[in-house]
Amino acid sequence: MQKFNYQKSNKAAGKIYIGLDHGYGNIKTAHRVFQTGIECYDEEPIVSTNYVKYRDKYYVIGESHLVYQGNKTETDDFYILTLAGLAEEMKYRGLHEADVVLAVGLPLAWVKTQAAEWRNYLMREKELDFSFRKERYKVHLCGLEIFPQGLAAVHNQGSMPGMNMLVLSLIHISEPTRPEPIS
């Protein structure tokens, strides 16, 4: 059983790390998966409660999938989906306020060409105050680590039998060190 850094106030005691996989079909965290569909409204949705409220706009999440975009930073879609992913993982951990280091991946082919832009996109605001499913979240984004896709997912696992061993043999991770993120 993994122990999380909690306090009774629903605020994390110290930094927490949250990994997000920004897929076109789904956003994935260590404990949650949801579809990437996103629709923006000026008024609170009547039917759905599965929305992010951010800067006086309402973004209904997860009712479809996004289409492929060669550059995920051209719209605010993945930024809003990141907020939903942060909220999902924080809710799982019993938190509503935290200092967060965000760990994300990029396809290997995009690492050199898009890492700096992805960093600027996700770190454009360090103090986040938003609601998800009518619950308020406050996040101090104190860091961002970018890894080649697949690396962050493998790093946390103790043993991974089967085909996943191919990934491990390519990157050779040994504890207690961890791979260096891409600058």
PLM features per residue range, with description:
Residues 1-166, 183:
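Nucleotide/phosphate-binding catalytic cleft detector across ATP-hydrolyzing
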Residues 164-174:
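Short, intrinsically disordered, charge-balanced linker/junction segments flanking boundaries
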Residues 172-175, 179-183:
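Single conserved hydrophobic/aromatic residue that forms the stacking wall/gate
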